[in-house]
Amino acid sequence: MSQLSLSWLGLGPEVAFPWQTLLLFGASWILAQILTQIYAAYRNFRRLRGFPQPPKRNWLMGHVGMVTPTEQGLKELTRLVGTYPQGFLMWIGPMVPVITLCHSDIVRSILNASAAVALKDVIFYTILKPWLGDGLLVSAGDKWSRHRRMLTPAFHFNILKPYVKIFNDSTNIMHAKWKRLISEGSSRLDMFEHVSLMTLDSLQKCVFSFDSNCQEKSSEYIAAILELSALVAKRHQQPLLFMDLLYNLTPDGMRFHKACNLVHEFTDAVIRERRRTLPDQGLDEFLKSKAKSKTLDFIDVLLLTKDEDGKELSDEDIRAEADTFMFEGHDTTASGLSWILYNLANDPEYQERCRQEVQELLRDRDPEEIEWDDLAQLPFLTMCIKESLRLHPPVTVISRCCTQDILLPDGRTIPKGIICLISIFGIHHNPSVWPDPEVYNPFRFDPENIKDSSPLAFIPFSAGPRNCIGQTFAMSEMKVALALTLLRFRLLPDDKEPRRQPELILRAEGGLWLRVEPLTAGAQ
């Protein structure tokens, strides 16, 4: 074997080649990587000095536990936003920085960045992947861009119009249930419980053309979705269980995978049946049969859509997008509508004005049903919805981790790789963005009052390339359900003030309870 003298390095006499040389090079490479990381961290820390920091709880924990997912945590966040209106820096332990942005003028650079640059924070979204696969909520890069383009037609007005009939029907079922409960002496109702089932009922009909009657009787599929949502929210608060290997060994992990399998089996069965039906009928006959029913459901659209190269979505991709829509569509809409009902219950003047607007719209109409064209004829009701979404945004925060440095409008830089939280709740409650932000005032959204506001001052559906693709669907459903509810019921606040609970969506501890009184025909 050839010999190599390393005495000039001070490493002694001749040594064997190549193993010692490879070892030296390997050690040098590792050292170089360590030094590179240390330098990058040092450089990042210097650039992060431009972001103000609240006092740390202690040197080891940093700011961990300072803003908790509780009512008190939201109050602390509101205080921080008042103190640091542009945003602030917090630390997870001694080494992990997290930037929170809470002003509409500052978030523009990140929200408008391409999906390839402003990636979703993988730590949280990874725990959704066993359930939602590579759906729009979880996927990134080229796959996300391709799916986004292919799914956009599913939310075209012509597709959404027939869904308004479904929204009416599902709301009618919920109201019939309310009247029965009230007649039995139960006028105090948990809005989250009832509205969640109503939105799931609508979604199952819009996505699968399937009626499980879930508002009146138990459904394994609906129960599995509710369980998955609860388990994901619970796991989100337990960072040690983010590791799949550990989580899968827990009782919650086993329940999660059992519920996942049930949901996947249901979706797969629907897709297989549609795949079988489509070639039997042929595309033209399939579309004719759908035209007669006047409804093309979400699965139909996904089966028929093709990309620029004429390629279809795989069955796995269709399942991922359908499951994603069921998850995102029911929770966020249920939260939004529940808090709208709460805010109007607390302000009878606004509630009555909305009611009169609906009564005038539906005067002499039989049956009392909201149609697609009606949705644009409810300006004050729409203002009330938007103000509630400002005060109680269903999604309180979104996270990004950028692949390159992001220059903010004020000249500061967010270094690549740093977790950045865009606090929707913070922006909506920022007194430098919204005067008197804790006051429910629908007139903020009067067209004259809002015309000069930043488009990023109100972002309940996010903004930019990765905004919510289903926001028109959600707004339409909320308008229909709210209009019919105010037409038939008077909403009154509960004796106990709710305590907000920001999980995956903004909930209320122990439910969001209201008292509900049916309106007589004369009162209507």
UniProtKB/Swiss-Prot annotation:
Belongs to the cytochrome P450 family. This is Cytochrome P450 4F1. Its cofactor is heme. PANTHER family: CYTOCHROME P450 FAMILY 4 (PTHR24291), LEUKOTRIENE-B4 OMEGA-HYDROXYLASE 3 (PTHR24291:SF190). GO terms for biological process: arachidonate metabolic process; icosanoid metabolic process; leukotriene B4 catabolic process; omega-hydroxylase P450 pathway; response to toxic substance. Optimum pH is 7.5. A cytochrome P450 monooxygenase involved in the metabolism of arachidonic acid and its oxygenated derivatives. Mechanistically, uses molecular oxygen inserting one oxygen atom into a substrate, and reducing the second into a water molecule, with two electrons provided by NADPH via cytochrome P450 reductase (CPR; NADPH-ferrihemoprotein reductase). Participates in the conversion of arachidonic acid to omega-hydroxyeicosatetraenoic acid (20-HETE), a signaling molecule acting both as vasoconstrictive and natriuretic with overall effect on arterial blood pressure. PROSITE patterns: CYTOCHROME_P450. Its main location: endoplasmic reticulum. It is an enzyme of class 1 (oxidoreductase). Its EC number is 1.14.14.94. It catalyses: (5Z,8Z,11Z,14Z)-eicosatetraenoate + reduced [NADPH--hemoprotein reductase] + O2 = 20-hydroxy-(5Z,8Z,11Z,14Z)-eicosatetraenoate + oxidized [NADPH--hemoprotein reductase] + H2O + H(+); 5-hydroxy-(6E,8Z,11Z,14Z)-eicosatetraenoate + reduced [NADPH--hemoprotein reductase] + O2 = 5,20-dihydroxy-(6E,8Z,11Z,14Z)-eicosatetraenoate + oxidized [NADPH--hemoprotein reductase] + H2O + H(+); 8-hydroxy-(5Z,9E,11Z,14Z)-eicosatetraenoate + reduced [NADPH--hemoprotein reductase] + O2 = 8,20-dihydroxy-(5Z,9E,11Z,14Z)-eicosatetraenoate + oxidized [NADPH--hemoprotein reductase] + H2O + H(+); leukotriene B4 + reduced [NADPH--hemoprotein reductase] + O2 = 20-hydroxy-leukotriene B4 + oxidized [NADPH--hemoprotein reductase] + H2O + H(+). One of its GO terms (cellular component) is endoplasmic reticulum membrane. It holds the Pfam family p450. Heme binds at residues 328, 468. It is a single-pass membrane protein; Peripheral membrane protein. Gene3D superfamilies: Cytochrome P450. One of its GO terms (molecular function) is arachidonate monooxygenase activity. Expressed in liver. Keywords: Endoplasmic reticulum, Heme, Iron, Membrane, Metal-binding, Microsome, Monooxygenase, Oxidoreductase, Transmembrane, Transmembrane helix. It is found in: Endoplasmic reticulum membrane; Microsome membrane. The chain crosses the membrane at residues 15-35. It comes from Rattus norvegicus (Rat). It comes from the Eukaryota. Highly expressed in aflatoxin B1-induced hepatic tumors.
